[in-house]
Amino acid sequence: MSSKTPLLDTIASPADTRGLSLAELKQLAAEVRAETIDAVSVTGGHLGAGLGVVELTVALHHVFETPKDIVIWDVGHQAYPHKILTGRRDRIRTLRQGGGLSGFTKRAESEYDPFGAAHAATSISAALGFCAARDAKGEDNSVIAVIGDGSLGAGMAYEAMNAATDTTKRLIVILNDNDMSIAPPVGGMSAYLANLVSGGAYRSVRKLGKTVVEKLPTPMREAARKAEEYARGMVTGGTFFEELGFYYIGPIDGHDMDALVSVLKNAKAFGDKPVLVHCVTQKGKGYAPAEGAADKLHAVVKFDVVTGQQQKAAGGPPSYTKVFAQELIKQAEKDDKIVAITAAMPSGTGLDLFGKAFPERTFDVGIAEQHAVTFAAGMAADGMKPFAAIYSTFLQRGYDQVVHDVAIQGLPVRFAMDRAGLVGADGPTHAGSFDIGFMGALPGMVLMAAADEVELARMVATAAEIDDRPSAFRYPRGEGLGLDMPAIAEPLEIGKGRIVREGTSVAIVSFGTRLSESLKAADLLAARGLSATVCDARFAKPLDLDLLLRLAREHEAIITVEEGSMGGFGAFVLQALAQHGALDRGLKIRTLCLPDVFQDQDKPDAMYAQAGLDAEGILRGALSAMGMDNVSAAGAGRRA
């Protein structure tokens, strides 16, 4: 291993950190930070968050006996230093690669990852579950949840904190405040106060005072309790957490190893109520290019360690995300009722561009998808035209609101479902696999999928005109095909697909961007003597029933293709054909969709090939339906 990390080279597991001095822990943190930077420069990934918690990670593994003591990282963006210290350093340069380490915590990967993560605000609830199980079994290990201040925008975190004191007396929550959105540290006095209020002497005096107070009449007793908590809250900023039943410590400098170790040891000794330790950290800490970047190099591709310069790909076609944003801006220029809503992802959804054009019509509600959906519903109910741009995977978090607050009331909220289908390096936690099924199940919903960037623009225009019911359109991560874009897109006719290529034997019906692979599959079929019709469905709801019945009459087989799970577009088509008797005449059908597994991270093309949704996979599906062996391209095949 590298001589640049002599101390880290001796660390095989967290147990090896427990005999280190404070000076050695500081050295170890510096080496872990260097290793994290070097590894992510090779793989790309989430850099800034991990750099901000290096000292905290080292201190946690030094003070607590992991994996016996449970440490749960919220989201998991910050877990790279944790992985380096927990026996995965030899694989750290496989982060987010096919067959490599996950970019998040993952139970199947290590005993030091007791709970998987990737979506925000789950850590405290999971930690409470571990506490309840521990208490029921009569065990005494510590349970720690590390959650960022951004995740506190999600209601689930407060639901868990509200239930904490009713669940257990032994829980540690560490608030990693890297935006100083709650309270900044106040120099040495802040660290001194944090250490003071977490120490045994202070708590003993406090306990004695409470004993005396209990002898007072009820009104005076309540007044004394409030006075003590608010007095402490004024100097520590923790009154809110105290009201939720936590003993608040902080804010402390999350890069001060001495303070971290001291306070964590004190917190470990608590046993009479949950503890919240407020650590203020700096995202991107210790790497100048990250500290100087507006986003603190939150997510990066491969980069030069010396300069921080990222190895951006040569300019290609605009991304689907950008196409969505640009068309939404065009529609908003002619309709002042159009507004846009994002849940803490303005850049990821392209709404940062919309926000520059229409700041007063752009709403970032934070990590709060449930609120985002019902907020949009309220705006729609009062005559506005809201577009809620939310990653498919995150829309899952607001599904009850989609059903109850939008669909049942028939409100015209427009859902722009970005990152639909497989997303590559972020793996199964971020894949947009299920939205076709869960959105298509809702009465009255108009559900579209773009085959290319021109189609996406037309779907934005279509959604803008739908005023009597909810609508949704899905589109993938990545670049479009480089097609010429119209000055302003024309809306589509609701529920009507299009024939892209006419054939006679097999009909391939694509929903989404698998259309290009479907056309390639048609070429492969032609080489085998089979003529294929290729259709872009455009709509999963309402289906183009006239088109589907025509295809059923005129072809021997129908193959549906979609970038989603089972129970989606193919299932809708199959049910519609069955209900109209189209299967009674021996029509052959195959529904090609994502496999019934959670696919691990890899390059998207490789993942779709594994799923059988590339041209070769579609070819195999068609040949299977026709009862033919998959022979060489030059052969005509034979009947099975």
From Swiss-Prot:
Catalytic activity line of the entry: D-glyceraldehyde 3-phosphate + pyruvate + H(+) = 1-deoxy-D-xylulose 5-phosphate + CO2
InterPro entries linked to this entry: Dxylulose-5-P_synthase, THDP-binding, Transketo_C/PFOR_II, Transketolase-like_Pyr-bd, Transketolase_BS, Transketolase_C, Transketolase_CS
Annotated residues for binding of Mg(2+): 149, 178
Cofactor(s) this protein cannot do without: Mg(2+); thiamine diphosphate
Binding site for thiamine diphosphate: 77, 118-120, 150-151, 178, 287, 369
GO BP: 1-deoxy-D-xylulose 5-phosphate biosynthetic process; glyceraldehyde-3-phosphate metabolic process; terpenoid biosynthetic process; thiamine biosynthetic process
Gene3D superfamilies: 3.40.50.920, 3.40.50.970
EC number: 2.2.1.7
Coiled-coil segments on the chain, per record: none
CDD domains: TPP_DXS (cd02007), TPP_PYR_DXS_TK_like (cd07033)
Keywords: Isoprene biosynthesis, Magnesium, Metal-binding, Thiamine biosynthesis, Thiamine pyrophosphate, Transferase
Pathway terms, separated by semicolons: Metabolic intermediate biosynthesis; 1-deoxy-D-xylulose 5-phosphate biosynthesis; 1-deoxy-D-xylulose 5-phosphate from D-glyceraldehyde 3-phosphate and pyruvate: step 1/1
GO molecular function terms noted in the UniProt entry: 1-deoxy-D-xylulose-5-phosphate synthase activity; magnesium ion binding; thiamine pyrophosphate binding
NCBIfam families linked: dxs (TIGR00204), PRK05444.2-2 (NF003933)
Subunit structure: Homodimer.
Function description: Catalyzes the acyloin condensation reaction between C atoms 2 and 3 of pyruvate and glyceraldehyde 3-phosphate to yield 1-deoxy-D-xylulose-5-phosphate (DXP).
Family: Belongs to the transketolase family. DXPS subfamily.
Official protein name in the record: 1-deoxy-D-xylulose-5-phosphate synthase
Originating organism: Caulobacter vibrioides (strain NA1000 / CB15N) (Caulobacter crescentus)
